[in-house]
């Protein structure tokens, strides 16, 4: 199946909220939660996508003609390209009843591994969600990053014990998850964390720890102070706070501040290999992509993941070659027009 055929098939089964748009840009689903949309009037999601599109790349083909290498070492695991499936949860609430969270992860995690990347897995108020994710990760050699919500410390410890048994190569927390409307006043309680609390969580993890939901230099420095080995520059796809900057806008300053000291990932509106290139040029080491993987799996299961990863890789390779970059280390900010 082609990418377009998979998108069309997904429209028949992805549920009442997501429209499986040809371009996933937040316009058709703004202010749709439950669903794939963003909080408030939806500008967070829309701005995320638009700001990547506003960036232009500098073409330069007066360079050596040799193969392009997109491989990336991620906490000791080599991946084929610096792209990861973002953590998603409560699928039946947001995307219809075709897949439970467990069924989705049972397709996503091995399909990502087979195609040379890795998946971050999601969390939710139902404890079976993380239990299922841990089981899938264990069955696939720990090839993935379980992502825990910022619950109270007792619940975090329970979930850390659960996922550590799966031996993942890293563990994450989407610390901005407390802003999700459907988590408000829920049990277990979720909320922000101090540097001291985060330091305690990092120590309990006993794995490289990634803090997802960083949008300022100050936040990045606090994550570093707490001992995190990586961050994800992210506004949760616009789902936790409306009218904030896009991840593309804040990424360069954050990368300049902490990029030499920790791994920097970014998400939010990244859809193509060209977008991946732009993110790397602005200082990211890798990217997370969320909503499009939903459509690929709902449209064609594991085949959808394969088609999308191959599309991203081909687009990234083409952009690198046309800009004179033959490895990820060759990608420089000067390859973005105006920088």
Task: Show which residues each predicted segment covers.
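Alpha/beta enzyme core
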Residues: 110, 138-139, 151-266, 273-296, ...
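N-terminal functional module of multi-domain proteins
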Residues: 44-130
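An N-cap/entry alpha-helix motif that binds or orients negatively charged groups
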Residues: 2-80
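Internal helix-turn-beta structural module
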Residues: 285, 301-329
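Long, hydrophobic, well-ordered secondary-structure blocks that form the structural core
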Residues: 118, 129-155
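Flexible, glycine/proline-enriched loop segments at strand-loop-helix junctions
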Residues: 95, 120-122, 144-151, 184-189
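N-terminal charge/polar-biased segments
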Residues: 1-9, 327-339
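Short hydrophobic alpha-helical runs that function as membrane-insertion/retention elements
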Residues: 118-123, 145-147, 232-233, 287-289
């Amino acid at each position: 199946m082609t990418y377009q055929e998979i998108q069309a098939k997904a429209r028949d089964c992805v549920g009442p909220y997501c429209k499986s748009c040809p371009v996933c840009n937040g316009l058709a689903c703004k202010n749709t939660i439950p669903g794939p949309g963003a909080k408030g009037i939806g500008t967070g999601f829309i701005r995320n996508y638009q700001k990547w599109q506003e960036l232009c790349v500098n073409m330069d083909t007066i360079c050596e003609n040799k193969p392009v290498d997109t491989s990336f070492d991620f906490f000791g695991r080599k991946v084929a390209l610096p792209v990861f499936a973002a953590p998603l949860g409560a699928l039946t609430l947001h995307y219809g009843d075709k897949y439970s969270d467990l069924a989705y992860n049972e397709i996503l995690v091995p399909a990502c591994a087979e195609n040379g990347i890795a998946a971050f897995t999601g969390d939710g108020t139902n404890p079976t969600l993380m239990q299922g994710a841990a089981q899938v990760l264990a069955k696939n050699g720990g090839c993935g990053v379980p992502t825990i919500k910022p619950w109270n410390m007792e619940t975090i410890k329970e979930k850390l014990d659960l996922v550590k048994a799966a031996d993942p190569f890293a563990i994450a927390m989407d610390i901005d998850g407390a802003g999700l409307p459907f988590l408000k006043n829920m049990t277990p309680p979720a909320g922000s964390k101090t540097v001291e609390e985060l330091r305690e969580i990092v120590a309990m993890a006993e794995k490289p720890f990634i803090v997802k939901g960083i949008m300022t230099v100050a936040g990045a420095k606090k994550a570093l102070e707490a001992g995190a080995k990586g961050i994800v520059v992210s506004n949760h796809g616009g789902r936790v706070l409306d009218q904030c900057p896009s991840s593309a806008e804040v990424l360069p300053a954050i990368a300049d501040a902490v990029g030499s000291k920790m791994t920097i990932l970014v998400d939010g509106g990244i859809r193509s290999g060209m977008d991946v290139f732009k993110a790397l040029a602005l200082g990211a080491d890798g990217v997370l992509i969320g909503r499009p993987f939903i459509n690929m799996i709902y449209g064609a299961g594991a085949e959808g993941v394969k088609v999308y990863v191959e599309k991203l890789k081909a687009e990234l390779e083409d952009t690198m070659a046309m800009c004179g970059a033959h490895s990820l280390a060759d990608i420089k900010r000067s390859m973005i027009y105006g920088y």
